[in-house]
């Protein structure tokens, strides 16, 4: 297993993937891994775990670092974050602002995204 650092693009792609579910559907970790082919398995699993730690999922079922997990839905917090970063333009601005700081934690990235949206609304 290689070392993994936080990849905001992977987080965004996972959230978009989970958001695409119809009401009442769930998605398996393997399905997310198969959809997000640009990332390796360990990277996707690591970022699913980071989403869990940041309370982005209402419920998950799995064993630690297992491929056989399942995600049930996004939390309101995740929906809000995704609404702020869904637009490619706002996402680029968010990543640009974050890069000026350096490596940022997920809560900081959420705040930056919120600030970018507020700035877009004011202009």
PLM feature segments, named:
Residues 3-36:
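Short amphipathic alpha-helical interface segments
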Residues 18-21, 51, 82-85:
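Generic structural signal for hydrophobic core residues of well-folded globular domains
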Residues 66-97:
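Short, amphipathic alpha-helical interaction segments positioned at domain boundaries
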Residues 85-123:
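Exposed, interaction-prone assembly regions rather than primary DNA-binding/catalytic cores
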Residues 37-54, 69:
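Short amphipathic alpha-helical interaction segments
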């Amino acid at each position: 297993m290689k070392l993994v650092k936080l990849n905001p693009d992977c987080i965004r792609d996972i959230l978009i993937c989970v958001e695409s579910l119809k009401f009442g559907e769930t998605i398996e970790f393997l399905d997310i891994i198969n959809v997000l082919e640009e990332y390796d398995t360990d990277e996707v699993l690591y970022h699913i775990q980071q989403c869990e730690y940041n309370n982005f999922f209402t419920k998950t079922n799995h064993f630690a670092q297992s491929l056989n997990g399942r995600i049930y839905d996004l939390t309101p917090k995740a929906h809000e974050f995704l609404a702020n970063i869904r637009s490619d333009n706002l996402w680029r601005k968010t990543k640009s602002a974050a890069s000026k700081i350096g490596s940022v934690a997920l809560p900081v990235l959420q705040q930056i995204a919120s600030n970018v949206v507020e700035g877009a609304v004011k202009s």
